[in-house]
C-alpha cells in the first residue's frame, strides 16, 4: 500500500508518503527490513528508514459506521525516497533522483532527452526512468554519453561520474 497524506494536514514521522510492503512470498517477512537495517551500518551507502507495522483496517466506504477493524497482518513500512527523503538524509533535495524501471546504461537518444527538447516525451522517459527529483537531465545524459564512448578509458569515466568507494561497497553488499 502507498498512503499519501494531504498537504498541510501534517506528517507521520516526517513523511507524507507511507509505503507498506507485505512481502507475501517471503515466509519470514523480515529479509527486506534486515537488508535496510544492515545498510544503516555502512556510511558509504544510503539506507531508508523502516519499521514493522501490524496493520488493521476499518472499511467504512459503504457508509457503515459500525464496521469492525480487520487484521491485515504484518507489513514493513519503508521511507519514500523523494525530495523529502533526500533532504532527511542530508542530500540535495533538488538533486537528480530516478526510479529505474528499465535501464542498462544505454544512451536511448530517442527517449532520454532534455525536457526543453521539442521531441521530449515525458511518458516514454518515465517508462525507463521515473523522475523523482530534478527534471534537469544534463548530468544523466553526459554520464551516459561518456559510458558509451569507448574511446574514453573506463577508469576516467568512473572517476568523473561515479563514487568508486560507493560502488565498491554496493557491490560488496
Question: Residues of each region from the PLM?
Answer:
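Phosphate/dinucleotide-binding and metal-coordinating scaffold of catalytic cores
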Residues: 1-173
